[in-house]
């Protein structure tokens, strides 16, 4: 059974006679963003799961509260392994509307992956009690290149918090350069009221875990949310 949420109500429903998607299902990838389900093994990295001929055209991949972007040095971000039967947005760099790429997930031998240590534990994003937010069906991610805090050095216990007009819309533990911060958007539900909408520019603050300080992040290079 699954459920849907309308306002503060929950409606339960069941899907009968569903046909499982075969592991070798072939997807058609069009320009820009495509929402597809992952059919492989839990914990397989992006590079191991995507065929080379598709990966070279990928810009970024977004899951529920996690994201990765491809750089010259490989993939960076909080999404480093896929989770079976979860949906992912694959955004590509195809510019020709008539170009279609076809692919199937690479599903290697599971025992071989374990023996080679290539399967990663799928990590759910941590949350911070005083800065909780709701997962939205609309989300964007901001990647931090570097932060200058004079004499303060960030640790892996510190957090970056995203706000929209003083409403917390995302948070992520500091993970060094290219830490990605989710910024949730308003998707019509009460739980996301006040969240980002097209054109909004979120604010960011740093939460120092050791002292409880909340420091403003000043940047002139924050793209509008969309």
PLM features per residue range, with description:
Residues 1-226:
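N-terminal exported-region signature
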